[in-house]
């Protein structure tokens, strides 16, 4: 795959849960994986469009730079971690720590996500159409979180924020690109209260 010409198409069959499939791609190619994968599928992706017709193990799209990844099933923990760009669409549920330390990636989850998601998330958008576990957005920076369902609890320095017309437009664009037919008006927005950016001894118990 790494020597592929632009717009080439690849089909991977019977992946059998193997690890590190379609990792480090750096060209405008299309990859379809028919089946479920193990750890780190599509990690460090750049430019490529990838579709997984199954579920994925931990670390899918870790440190993704650009391109698009669609997961038709569920994703294990820390999906999209440290991602700098591109779009990750998970049609099922995502486990804990989804989008931790994200740095520009857009993550759309049609189902639910687990605890500690968007921990130290710096930029980008995390969109959840279902429910969210404990400690959402703990120590978050400037990433934006949109949730349609319930949130069990918010992490340190994460608060609910107003959804402006601009935010609704951005949300509608990403939902449309993900082929998810939901109204932006049904979502709540969460982000940083910006109180823990600099260490203050009076806030010690909040860290």
Predicted feature residues:
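Intrinsically disordered, low-complexity terminal regions
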Residues: 1-21, 91, 110, 115-116, ...
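Feature marks extracellular polysaccharide-active and adherence modules
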Residues: 13-15, 34-36, 43-44, 53-55, ...
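Beta-strand repeat architectures
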Residues: 1-9, 19-29, 39-48, 59-66, ...
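Glycine- and acidic-residue-rich phosphate-binding/metal-coordinating active-site segment common to enzymes
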Residues: 96, 102-104, 108-111, 115
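N-terminal hydrophobic or amphipathic segments with adjacent small-residue motifs
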Residues: 29-32, 48-51, 118, 131, ...
């Amino acid at each position: 795959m790494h020597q592929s010409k632009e717009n080439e198409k690849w089909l991977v069959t019977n992946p059998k849960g193997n690890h590190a499939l379609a990792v480090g791609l750096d060209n405008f190619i299309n990859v379809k994986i028919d089946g479920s994968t193990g750890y780190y599928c599509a990690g460090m992706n750049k430019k490529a469009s990838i579709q997984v017709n199954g579920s994925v193990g931990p670390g899918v799209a870790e440190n993704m730079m650009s391109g698009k990844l669609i997961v038709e099933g569920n994703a294990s923990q820390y999906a999209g971690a440290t991602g700098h760009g591109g779009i990750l669409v998970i049609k099922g549920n995502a486990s804990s720590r989804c989008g931790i330390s994200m740095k520009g990636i857009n993550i759309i989850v049609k189902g639910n996500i687990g605890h500690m998601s968007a921990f130290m998330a710096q930029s980008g958008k995390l969109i959840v159409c279902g429910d969210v576990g404990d400690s959402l957005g703990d120590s978050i920076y400037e990433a934006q979180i949109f949730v349609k369902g319930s949130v069990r609890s918010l992490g340190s320095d994460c608060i609910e924020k107003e959804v402006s017309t601009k935010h609704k437009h951005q949300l509608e664009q990403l939902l449309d690109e993900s082929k998810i037919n939901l109204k932006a008006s049904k979502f709540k927005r969460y982000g940083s209260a910006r109180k823990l950016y600099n260490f203050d001894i009076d806030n010690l118990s909040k860290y």
